[in-house]
Structure formats: C-alpha cells, structure tokens
C-alpha cells in the first residue's frame, strides 16, 4: 500500500476516533476548517479575475470562526434533536426532517450567518439589518434549492454520527456561496 493511502487511512482513523470521543469539538473544528477553505476558494476566483485585489486573510478567518463557533455545534445539536423526534431511518422521516430543517433551521441559520459575520466584521446594527434586507431572502431561496436534496441524502443514508461531517463536505460549495454573498456590497 502506498504511503499516501496509509496516511489517509491513519488520518481517517484518527478523525473517526475524535468524532466519537469529542463529537462537538471535532465537528466545530471541521466546520471552521471547511469554511476557511470555502472562503479561500472564493477569494482565489476573485483574485484570478482582479489582479489588483489581495487575499483577505481576516475575511477567511472570520468565516472559519463562524464555522467553528456556530455551524459545527449548531448542527450537531440540531441533527441530534431531529433524530430524537424522528428516529427512523426511513424516507418518510428523512422527508419530515428535511422539511423541518428548511422551514425552521435554514431561515434562522441564514440570519445567524449574516448577523454573525456582520458582528465579526465590526459592522453597526444598522449595517447588519441592511445586509439582511439585501441578501437574506436571496440566500434563503437558494438554500431551498440546494439543501433539500443534500439533506434528504443526509437523513436517509448517512449515519447520525457522520451527518455533520457529510453536511460540512457539501458545505464547501455552499460556504463559498455564503462567502460570496457576504462579500457582495
């Protein structure tokens, strides 16, 4: 077996061990790291289009902080709540969970995202409210297009311990979208 495969197997084993021992912390760190990656991807695209622009490390770190402090822990407990009330691994329960997620959690999460990023950016309350008025609905509508399918797969086929990890991997693209929405003026 190649060294790369051995290394990947060891990393996977370590990650799964941490996920079982420290589920919230592991999901928080994973979310933070992947939000950093998402924003870095967006900035890479922006930099390739505008040579005068510079990489904004603080922006990427704000995304990482939000992923770490909000996304990982929030979805750990949210998915746990949904699993408690709809424990069957059935299409019916998956559909119920994704519907509740879209109607309850998604609007709140998108509000938290723009508010949290505004706070981390040092924006005033009025600026945050203006950002919410400008981008919240567009983001939520996009959320309703993207996430139901992902969450159906997540709730129907992914074991509960891996749901946040699966969401985080899918979230690389979504996080890039959020980073772009947040950086738009």
UniProtKB/Swiss-Prot annotation:
It comes from the Eukaryota. One of its GO terms (cellular component) is cytoplasm. The chain crosses the membrane at residues 63-83, 100-120, 141-161. Keywords: Membrane, Transmembrane, Transmembrane helix. Coiled coil: none annotated. Belongs to the peroxisomal membrane protein PXMP2/4 family. Its main location: membrane. The keyword Glycosyltransferase does not apply. The keyword Hydrolase does not apply. This is PXMP2/4 family protein 4. It is found in: Membrane. PANTHER family: PEROXISOMAL MEMBRANE PROTEIN 2, PEROXISOMAL MEMBRANE PROTEIN 2, PXMP2 MPV17. Signal peptide: none annotated. InterPro entries: Mpv17_PMP22. It is a multi-pass membrane protein.
